């Protein structure tokens, strides 16, 4: 199993934008077959060094992660939206 984590710092991190981004990220559930589990959390502390949203995706293998990265729904809907509303993102991928 592989865990894929992405943290996003939104250009405008008001409550509405955070909720909308969370909804877009969670919309992958059931639409991206290689994503076995998806969890999205919104930062509550709001410190200057905090990122606003964290996405966690669980996939079966490194090959499945590659398929996830290239999935049409992930690329055309989710990535497109998140790139439009984010000023920065970081990711971390590791085996379990």
Regions found by a protein language model. Give the residues of each.
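A common structural junction motif
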Residues: 27-32, 73-78, 85
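Charge-dense polyanion-binding interfaces
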Residues: 80-96
């Amino acid at each position: 199993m592989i865990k894929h984590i992405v943290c996003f710092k939104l250009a405008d991190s008001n409550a509405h934008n955070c909720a909308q981004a969370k909804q877009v990220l969670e919309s992958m559930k059931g639409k991206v077959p290689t994503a076995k589990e998806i969890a999205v959390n919104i930062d509550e502390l709001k410190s200057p060094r905090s990122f606003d949203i964290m996405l966690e995706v669980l996939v079966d293998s490194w090959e499945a992660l590659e398929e996830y990265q290239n999935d049409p729904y992930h690329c055309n809907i989710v990535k497109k939206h998140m790139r439009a509303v984010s000023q920065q993102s970081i990711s971390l991928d590791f085996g379990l």
